[in-house]
């Protein structure tokens, strides 16, 4: 099962919510789920590193473990060159992904719901979605996951998503769970675990 963690790439939010992101990454690894992120910096990198650190401990015990999947966006829309080849460059890659999917899709942030955003792939690929603190881009991922009918937990501690509190988001997007602590997140993830 793939757990998509949708979070900000903003480094200042990563410093502020580092502990929260580490809890999420570590717990997903301990439960032996696969983790999907946008493969960028900020909280995406923190959650990915925590996942890999916990995964190493699991593998040291000769137990099976999940994989870290990174869905990368393009820096800009690829262009066809005269020689028939296309230009392509990743916008950001935190270097942690074990399975890396490079898209041609450049949009993010306020444009995160556009058809040229990799956020559609993130939302559709994940079986479950955990939302960490973030701005407009994280909010667009939440909205897409909700539109695609994914099970979602907001886990933001004292943070918010796009300036909205968890309660605001739960009212706006019916059926979303709010995780208040690690036990809430653990119980929610375990309730979806298939043996």
Segments predicted by a language model, with ranges:
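Residues at the starts of beta-strands that form the adenosine-phosphate
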Residues: 2, 34, 67-68, 151
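Short active-site oxyanion
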Residues: 32-35, 174-175
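Nucleotide-sugar donor-binding patch of glycosyltransferase catalytic domains
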Residues: 152-178
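Acidic/glycine-enriched connector segments
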Residues: 20-31, 41-144, 148, 156, ...
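Short acidic-hydrophobic, aromatic-tinged amphipathic segments that line or gate anion-handling sites
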Residues: 99-104, 172-188
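Short, hydrophobic alpha-helical segments
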Residues: 189-195
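Generic N-terminal amphipathic, Lys/Arg-enriched alpha-helix
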Residues: 1-16, 24-31
